[in-house]
Amino acid sequence: MGFFVTSANPGKGADLGGLAGADAHCQSLARAAGAGNRTWRAYLSSGGASPVNARDRIGRGPWRNAKGEVVARDLEQLHGDNNLNLQTALTEKGEPVNGRRSQPNTHDILTGSQADGTAFAGSAEDRTCRDWTSGGEGSAMVGHHDREGLRDDAPSRSWNSSHPSRGCGMEALRSTGGAGLFYCFAAD
């Protein structure tokens, strides 16, 4: 396994304890699933004076889900024509994540990223819930792991850059169809 969607939020909405806290959550979930021997990174960008791009944190691929299915061979395919969808975006336990047509809808996945996997550098708008340290004020860019939205357009079908959340707390994340989940990739 080299890719999964977190099965649970660490408990504070989009306050993940920064990138380090999010990476630790990925590592902990992977360890519990028997894949802790790899180096796990959260697919999250951060802004500020020194932006960090999600795509630069996750290694070079290929990435397989818990069932061994390849979701992407490399960074180019991951940010292009990948195999990430409702059937393949599984948790570390190999379980599906509810999509837009399920109850509760949990298809909004935290990324803080643009479609090419880069940060919103220079943007005055918060797209990372204060670099993943806010569980209240702010907003996070989310993607749709099921590739479905309210419209049939590219952002609605984007796995990593669909729309901003209404806030950073769990209630705000739930109100737009999320559960504070995020993607984890093996960087090695």
Which functions belong to the PLM regions below?
Residues 1-188:
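Secreted/extracellular ectodomain signature
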